[in-house]
């Protein structure tokens, strides 16, 4: 067969192979969560684990029950809300709070950055083998989050948490939170991002506690939302001192301002 005819005969097969390779290269290896999301409106989701005090019917240990009762005394019948005084929601609170506040995901191969509009709170999930050594991880409200892919599901383990006594699902510094993120579509074709969290904490709970929240795309923006939380912690310290002294637990934010003025 003449050389030119062989080339013409092979050309369609080569073109098909190149096209297939191009499509494969264009397909992402994992789902991309990048975008702004808001609470899914397709179905009721129940109580979230944000601020507002501990939920009822939690499988509490005796120590967990004691801590819950202590916190309820600290916040009083008016149920003081730490979120209203600028304390970070942390994990899982910022992931599971319902309402109109959007949440933004920015995804890179080795990191998922999540920004909650309230307080412009940020958490980072580090994906893959490149991780901070355990001895260098500092406890925080959001903890340290280490992620890996299991197919199309991002699996995350969050540790190094500060005490979350004020959460709807409270936890101690010993808590480990296992999380899962994945995307699907509902019957109407709406894209749905599902967040699942399992709290394992032998101090508070006799068994794991699970949280599920769902999000849908939000056609809007994350807006600036600055706030400082020092006043909240000072108020809580005042009330804790009253509790330990057996005094009425009635400190108010005005008392915090007055104490600050006296120190100046």
Predicted regions mapped to residue ranges:
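N-terminal signal peptide c-region/cleavage motif recognized by signal peptidases
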Residues: 20-22
């Amino acid at each position: 067969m003449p050389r030119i005819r062989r080339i013409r005969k092979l050309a369609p097969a080569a073109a098909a192979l190149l096209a297939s390779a191009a499509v494969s290269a264009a397909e992402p290896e994992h789902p991309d969560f990048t975008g702004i999301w808001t609470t899914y409106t397709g179905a009721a989701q129940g109580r979230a684990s944000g601020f507002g005090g501990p939920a009822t019917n939690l499988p509490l240990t005796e120590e967990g029950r004691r801590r819950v009762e202590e916190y309820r005394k600290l916040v009083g019948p008016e149920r003081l809300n730490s979120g209203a005084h600028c304390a970070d929601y942390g994990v899982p609170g910022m992931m599971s709070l319902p309402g109109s506040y959007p949440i933004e995901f920015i995804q890179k191969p080795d990191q998922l950055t999540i920004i909650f509009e309230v307080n412009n709170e940020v958490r980072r999930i580090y994906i893959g083998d490149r991780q901070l050594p355990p001895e260098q991880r500092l406890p925080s409200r959001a903890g340290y989050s280490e992620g890996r892919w299991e197919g199309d599901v991002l699996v995350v383990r969050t540790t190094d948490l500060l005490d979350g006594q004020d959460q709807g699902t409270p936890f101690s510094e010993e808590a480990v939170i296992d999380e899962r993120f994945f995307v699907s579509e509902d019957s109407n074709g709406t894209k749905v991002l599902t967040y699942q969290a399992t709290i394992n904490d032998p101090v508070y709970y006799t068994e794991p506690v699970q949280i599920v929240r769902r999000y849908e795309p939000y056609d809007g923006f994350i807006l600036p939302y600055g706030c400082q939380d020092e006043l909240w912690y000072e108020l809580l310290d005042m009330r804790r001192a009253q509790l330990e002294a057996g005094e009425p637990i009635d400190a108010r934010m005005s008392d915090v301002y007055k104490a600050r003025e006296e120190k100046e």
